A protein has these predicted regions:
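Assembly/oligomerization scaffold segments
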Residues: 1-120
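Envelope-exposed proteins and targeting segments
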Residues: 6-8, 44, 66, 85-90, ...
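Solvent-exposed coil/turn segments that connect beta secondary-structure elements
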Residues: 15, 51-53, 73-75, 90-97, ...
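An acidic/polar, Gly/Ser/Thr-rich interaction patch typically located in mid-to-C-terminal regions
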Residues: 33-63, 224-412
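Second-shell loop/turn segments in exported
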Residues: 57, 120-129, 162-168
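Sec/Tat-exported extracytoplasmic proteins
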Residues: 58, 143, 181-188, 360
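Short beta-strand-centered interaction patches in the first periplasmic/extracellular domains
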Residues: 105-108, 112-114, 153-247
Length: 412
């Protein structure tokens, strides 16, 4: 049985410059709400499909810029609420407007207002010898600079082990943070960060830290119908590894060349997927994965970051940065190349970036392999929530989860 719920509030909130003169409730239009979070997205989003009985889309000229507010009361899990002052979801457009003689339906798309601010903000100046997590806090948050994104949303930036100096070059703030993610390292052996937004705020976190979290909940597959809200309603395993694209991106092997303008010297760094020390490394036939499939070139202009005539004294070599980036790219591609998609009764307490335990029954043919310690065929285990979608309305409430785990470095 699905969770008992009631949508108690679903409103369009007017803002300065919009045609709507007062709050407009969508409750009479039987709204269906979809709410999204993803480790790959720097913004939460939502859409509301409704029966436009009052013709608000056409009569009030809803074109975007309004704020979205909704509240859903769950019998057991409390209230799930999106507030225009805390979460700041702005309507970015209206789609699927379908007009018939007796009714009109429409869908409102909303996304964090910071995504729109990002399009007008630009990063200027130098960021010299600054830890990457500190740079993130300068680019977004309450303490952000005048050209960055000031927001009162929570910003959690996990400390990085390395620093990175760069010039803003008028990049957008969120684009800059995502550009810094593969350059960040939590230790000498752990590479790559993710920047994403959840219901609770912004997160800049190490991939390894996310994978090592303890599970917050357990969901099991059972054929017995009942009131168990931790059961899995549906599951599907997906493998999206594109060998051609992986070769084009240099995931298996690549070369990065450097030219130092100051010294006039040239060097290069070679990377292969074996550098990740994987217990189950991906292999290609005929030694295809051993030859570099991507060549990259960088110019090192250290003079752009020096003060006066003094030559910058950086403890981090360009080759070290290349190792961080190459290992981060490869690790991300491997982790997200396989996913387990499950559907569970709606659980608004879940967040992208949390770890859950999934328990699925083993086929009879796998029981023997399981007893022999071969865990590669067992889909049960701890998974990281990569993407999350709450679908609420139409007399049902489900949560769809896209789950990933590090199968390549997991111990058999």
């Amino acid at each position: 049985m699905e969770k008992k719920f009631r949508i108690t509030e679903c409103e369009i909130i007017p803002t300065e410059g919009t045609a709507l003169s007062e709050n407009f409730s969508l409750l009479n239009g039987s709204p269906v709400i979809n709410y999204y979070e993803s480790l790959k997205s720097p913004a939460i989003s939502a859409n509301v499909s409704f029966l436009d009985t009052d013709g608000v889309v056409s009569n009030e000229s809803i074109m975007g810029g309004e704020m979205l507010r909704f509240t859903v009361d769950f019998a057991e899990l409390g209230t799930f609420s999106i507030d225009e002052n805390k979460h700041k979801l702005m309507i970015g457009g209206v789609k699927n407007v379908n007009t018939k003689s007796s009714k009109q339906t429409a869908t409102l798309d909303a996304i964090s207002v910071e995504s729109f601010i990002n399009e007008t903000a630009r990063v200027a100046g130098r960021y010299k010898d600054t830890s990457i997590d500190e740079t993130v806090r300068k680019l977004i948050g309450e303490g952000a600079g005048i050209r960055a994104i000031k927001t009162d949303k929570s910003v959690f930036a996990e400390p990085t082990a390395n620093k990175y100096s760069f010039v803003g070059n008028l990049r957008r703030p969120i684009d800059t943070i995502q550009w810094l993610c593969p350059k960040a390292s939590s230790s000498t052996n752990h590479f790559g960060y993710l920047f994403y937004e959840t219901y609770d705020g912004y997160n800049f976190r190490s991939i390894d830290t996310l994978l090592k979290q303890p599970p917050v909940k357990t969901f099991s597959k059972t054929e017995i119908a009942g009131a168990d809200d931790s059961r899995i309603l549906n599951e599907q395993f997906n493998s999206s590894n594109d060998i051609g694209m992986a070769l084009r991106m240099g995931m298996y092997a690549n070369n990065t060349g450097y030219f130092d303008i100051r010294t006039g010297t040239f060097g290069y760094e070679t990377f292969t997927v074996t550098d990740l020390d994987l217990k189950r490394p991906p292999k290609l036939p005929g030694g295809l994965g051993e030859s570099p499939s991507r060549l990259m070139f960088r110019i090192l202009d250290v003079g752009a970051l020096q003060d006066g005539d003094a030559v910058p004294n950086s403890n981090q070599k360009a080759q070290d940065l290349a190792k961080y980036q190459n290992k981060s790219y490869a690790r991300n591609n491997l982790i997200f190349s396989q996913s387990l998609n499950i559907v569970v009764p709606c659980d608004p307490t879940l967040r992208a970036g949390q770890v859950i335990t999934v328990e699925l029954p083993l086929p009879t043919s796998d029981q023997k392999n399981k007893q022999m310690g071969d865990g590669t065929r067992d889909l049960s285990g701890d998974y990281l929530i990569s993407e999350l979608r709450h679908e609420i309305g139409g007399n049902r409430a489900h949560t769809q989860l896209s789950l990933v785990r590090d199968t390549f470095t997991a111990t058999a």
